[in-house]
Amino acid sequence: MTKLTARQKADLMEELTGLKRFSVSLTGDSHDADDLLQLTIERVLEKGMPADAHAGKWSYRVCRNLWLDELRARDVRTRHAKAEMAGNGDLGVSTADGLSRLEFERASSALSVLPEEQRSVLLLVAVEGHSYAEVAGILDIPIGTVMSRVARARRSLADKLA
């Protein structure tokens, strides 16, 4: 990979607003979104991108991959914490915790319950306004996969909101 060209830097700057919306959509939290956006820009500036890469597509892909890395890390930390609590004889989750979790799930938007793959694709198409072909390029997946994920996401949302 090479450092960014002047054109790629300009394109990246043009994508900041969309990247911010995408980050908020992925994280569901403005603080996490700010952190994710900062990490994305840092990574793109530090690591660069192929000379022929489109800055927008590349930056969305970097953003999504960083978020997936964060989700994996959180999962590992959560499992580790639960294992430690179980080792100390603590049951781990009380009834109050369970009720709070249920209330939280009810309050969450229908988007947040979608699988990450479906949510990312749907957000890029519906919120960011990218075409299926553009999303396929951003996420480096076949266009048919984009189409099926969008369809499944829409069906899931319809079921959830019915």
Q: Which sequence ranges carry the predicted segments?
A:
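A short, charge-rich alpha-helical start-of-domain segment used by transcription regulators
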Residues: 1-21, 25, 31-34, 50
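Residues within helix-turn-helix
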Residues: 31, 133, 144
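Structural recognition of an alpha-helix C-terminal capping motif at a helix-to-coil junction
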Residues: 35-42, 46, 53-65
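Arg/Lys-rich amphipathic alpha helix in sigma70-family domain 2
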Residues: 50, 62-82, 100
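Internal acidic/polar
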Residues: 77-109, 131
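Short helix-coil-helix linker/hinge
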Residues: 101, 111-119
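A short pre-motif secondary-structure segment
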Residues: 121-125
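DNA-recognition helix of helix-turn-helix
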Residues: 139-162
